[in-house]
Amino acid sequence: MIEAMTTRPAIARWALLVAILLAWEAVARWAALSPIIIASPSAVFLQIFRILSGDDAVPDFYFNAAITIGEILTAYLVTVVLGVFLGLAFASSKLVGDAFEPILLVFYAIPKIILYPLLILTLGIGVLPNIAFGVLLGVFVVTFNTSAGLRQVEPNYLRLAQSLGYGRPAIFFKVILPAAAPTIVAGLRLGFGYTIIGVITAELLVVSAGLGSLIDYATVNYLTSSLYALVLMTLAIGIAGNSLFSALERRWVK
């Protein structure tokens, strides 16, 4: 029964994906639209193969992909360390939380894109502002989810652990962290997605290197199938990360 319940949504998702691809192919082939405006899925997947094999007008794909992946991983590492640290600080000290959390909420509400020129002026053009912008987008959700997860632990669990003679480290690692883990992991998953958005957006804003620069190159040169292919390959990075964190969430919930 449980297997059937988990299989049905998967079948529905795949059926929807196939329907979208078929409709997309039909529109691209028979709607009398220029290939410059819309590329068919068959052309896009063929272009992905060409890009991966190096036989395409898109220059230095692997070099630029390595730059983007490196920027994403670096930005995400900083996001996790900084976000978890701030979340721990806010949750462990009411004074720190009351003093600094409202300030962070104000920055969270600001459109981050207006801060990117400041990063360019401070860090110059290159990978550093891209990494910083990725951190800027991802750190808030990691911080708030970490803080919320640590604060939502039932007081009865803490009192029970204290009555059993647990010390502070044991209470944290055996009671608080397992109870907060699902919320924290959800924040880490969302933070990864925001980090990708930040890095790619920064690469598009100031074209230097990375997948964002290739997307810009394909756009200005009307390489529509290459543009679609690059967008799909960029999405694949996010999907892979989301799948990993979804697996971690299922493990922690169990």
Role assignments for model-derived ranges:
Residues 132, 136, 168-202, 229, ...:
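Transmembrane alpha-helices
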Residues 212-249:
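Hydrophobic alpha-helical transmembrane segments of polytopic membrane proteins
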Residues 62-74, 97, 104-107, 124, ...:
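Alpha-helical membrane-interface segments at transmembrane helix boundaries
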Residues 150-156, 160-180, 220:
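Short helix-to-coil transition segments within interhelical loops
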Residues 74-104:
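Transmembrane-helix boundary motif in ABC transporter permease subunits
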Residues 1-18, 243-254:
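Transmembrane alpha-helical segments of polytopic membrane transport and secretion proteins
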Residues 2, 30-77:
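Periplasmic/extracellular loop-to-transmembrane helix junction in inner-membrane transport proteins
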Residues 105-141, 148-149:
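Generic hydrophobic transmembrane alpha-helix motif, especially the helices
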